[in-house]
Amino acid sequence: HLLQFNKMIKFETRKNAIPFYAF
């Protein structure tokens, strides 16, 4: 499910200044 996770990352990146995966 790497592609789905990638889409989630892009969504979070657009929604937040700091991506959630940075933590």
Swiss-Prot record:
One of its GO terms (cellular component) is extracellular region. It is an enzyme of class 3 (hydrolase). Expressed by the venom gland. Its cofactor is Ca(2+). Binds 1 Ca(2+) ion. It is found in: Secreted. One of its GO terms (biological process) is lipid catabolic process. GO terms for molecular function: metal ion binding; phospholipase A2 activity; toxin activity. Its main location: secreted. Belongs to the phospholipase A2 family. Group II subfamily. Snake venom phospholipase A2 (PLA2) that shows presynaptic neurotoxicity. PLA2 catalyzes the calcium-dependent hydrolysis of the 2-acyl groups in 3-sn-phosphoglycerides. Heterodimer of an acidic subunit and a basic chain. The acidic subunit is non-toxic, without enzymatic activity and comprises 3 peptides that are cross-linked by 7 disulfide bridges. The basic subunit is toxic, has phospholipase A2 activity and is composed of a single chain. This is Basic phospholipase A2 CB1. It comes from Crotalus basiliscus.
